[in-house]
Amino acid sequence: TGFGSWSAQAQGQSDHFVLPPGKAIYQPKEFAGQDWYSDTSRYSYRRMSCTDNLAIFREKGFGNDLAAPPDLEGHPMAVDLENLKYQLERFYLFYRDSLKFVKPGSQSEKYRMMAMIQYSLEGTAYGGDYDQVIGAFWATPNRLQDKRLNAVAHELGHSFQLQSIADGEGVAWGGNGIFEMGAQWMLWQVNPHWIDDETYHWDAFKKNTHKAFLHTENIYRSPYILEYWSERQGLPFIGELFRQGKKGEDPVMTYKRMQNLSQEQFNDEMFDAYQHLINFDYKRVFSITRPWANSFPDFRTCLEEKKDGWYQVRKAWCPENYGFNA
């Protein structure tokens, strides 16, 4: 697979249980007092698999084999552990080395990030951190079935976003919609076919481009401004944007400060960004995105004719701050 791999199953169930070499494994405060060497705990080292940079825990209900756990209420709970390990490590290395979402000295150099697989039918997956120490994410099997593991790529993006804050590298505005937009952009970096996989996001965005940049309805649908910024400023720029974000600012204010842009200059840049978006004119994914280029519907349906022969944009489609019509 190209990375270190370790599984509790390979170590046996002896009294001399040995943890894998390499980075340490953090035990969160909420599990203080639990014996993770014992198989009776909710999470256990005996139900853990590791890559060089991540520790994957599964709840007790899975038993000893993620490939053949007992069904839950008639639903299969199997997870392809080898694919999960491969993709997690691939995502991790890209986010660390290419996007540079963590800097040297990060606590992630000491500890493995943590993936907690829950024995549940809930469709939940979310990323964050444990105790402002190490990034983590939590997921149920129904979010771990696609081979590309898009949900995992997104949630691990959140793990890195929060890792940066845990490392004391800024406050990222105290939190806002760009966390979701940023995680989608990170997913798109490791899966350039993201729009093919989740075309419903693109279809929905085309109907809502008039809404404000960072409008909550669009934050999962529109990583395109971040793609434009990263193409202009380099891949590591987005991670630095998160580190530079201050309470009292929003991401636009932070970007303008970092680039020393006036409001007029920023407006011009946003217009250029949307010109690129219409044709999906991004070098990284240009050939892949041809099916989606210039695919906006006829805008005349969004206009109303006035008595003097002019047309006016309908009220519902008037652009909000940094929104656009096409």
Predicted regions and their residues:
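N-terminal low-structure segments adjacent to metalloprotease catalytic domains
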Residues: T1-S49, D308-A326
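Juxtacatalytic substrate-recognition/specificity segment
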Residues: C50-G175, F179-A183, H193-D196
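Intrinsic disorder/low-complexity segments
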Residues: Q9-Q11, I56, Y274
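Acidic/His/Gly-enriched intrinsically disordered linker/tail segments
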Residues: D129-Y130, D146-A151, A166-F237, F242-D281
